[in-house]
Amino acid sequence: MSIEHTSHDPSKPDPAKARTLAAALPWLKRYHGKIVVVKYGGNAMTDETLKRAFAEDIAFLRFAGFKPVVVHGGGPQISTMLDRLGIRSEFRGGLRVTTPEAMDVVRMVLVGQVQRELVGLINEHGPLAVGCSGEDAGLFTAEPANTVIDGEEVDLGLVGEVARVRPESVLDLIEAGRIPVVSSVAPDADGQVHNVNADSAAAALAVALGAEKLLVLTDVEGLYLDWPSSDDVIGEISPEALEEILPTLASGMVPKMGACLQAVRNGVPRATVVDGREPHAVLLELFTNEGVGTQVLPGVETKTRKARDTQS
């Protein structure tokens, strides 16, 4: 009896993969069984590859023993639907005014489109994700946002901030082994639904849940030390140092860094803005020493690095 040998050699074990997995051990130990709140937004919401990578990351966290919670907005999708329906947008100080007519669209898009798509992508990896909004079980109570532009208060209509969080419904989902996916709409004390800022909503929820970490996805590498004069990106910064420079930041970074500051000031141990343009950015941030963003962490000296795009 002869044994036929194929010309194809079996793949050899890859020690590099083993080292990568072993390097994740400290982070697995730190976050195992802990709640991590992730604010989903930016390019990760519009690029098909990044959408799927994000959903894989969130499912991975759940199977690795983390307790992920996702909060999302949907600015680009809202704008697209308003244009499609022929609803004219009014802007004040560069910010959209949310009229009652526009609010109906906001609610429809966030709860009925963005949330459903993300829940579906996560659930390709198992029956994990459950969608909800700030309206469900009284999760969020909103109040009108106090928006000041160039020293003057501006009325943006039905735009709100989270005034109160009742986290019990989300905690019930977490206890059942589910991944809550939360849309950032919420009623005020009179029942009028508002479009709430998803960054600050994620921070408020992270505080109420006693989360171990808040991640906020964005479309830049992190917080630049002196943009556009410098290509130095801040890797770590203390709440005190961030509070000092917050008024000088570009308008797009203020709500994101403000959310991180809000979370850490109110008991979340660490909060990070993450470069959501990077596939699997959530895993890279949580499981590597370098991370892919700017972390707000009490008691640290400000640390910087060169932006990746400028490195040779």
Swiss-Prot record:
Localization of this protein: Cytoplasm
Protein name: Acetylglutamate kinase
Catalytic activity, EC: 2.7.2.8
Catalytic activity: N-acetyl-L-glutamate + ATP = N-acetyl-L-glutamyl 5-phosphate + ADP
Functional description taken from the UniProt entry: Catalyzes the ATP-dependent phosphorylation of N-acetyl-L-glutamate.
Protein family membership: Belongs to the acetylglutamate kinase family. ArgB subfamily.
Positions marked as site (Transition state stabilizer): 39, 256
Recorded GO CC terms: cytoplasm
HAMAP family from the UniProt entry: ArgB
Source species, domain of life: Bacteria
Example of a GO MF term: acetylglutamate kinase activity
InterPro entries with a match to the protein in the record: AceGlu_kinase-like_sf (IPR036393), AcgluKinase_fam (IPR004662), ArgB (IPR037528), Asp/Glu/Uridylate_kinase (IPR001048), Glu/AcGlu_kinase (IPR001057), NAGK-C (IPR041727)
Annotated binding of substrate, by residue: 74-75, 96, 195
Cystine pairs: none
Any one biological process term the GO annotation gives: L-arginine biosynthetic process
Protein keywords: Amino-acid biosynthesis, Arginine biosynthesis, ATP-binding, Cytoplasm, Kinase, Nucleotide-binding, Transferase
Known pathway: Amino-acid biosynthesis; L-arginine biosynthesis; N(2)-acetyl-L-ornithine from L-glutamate: step 2/4
Main location: cytoplasm
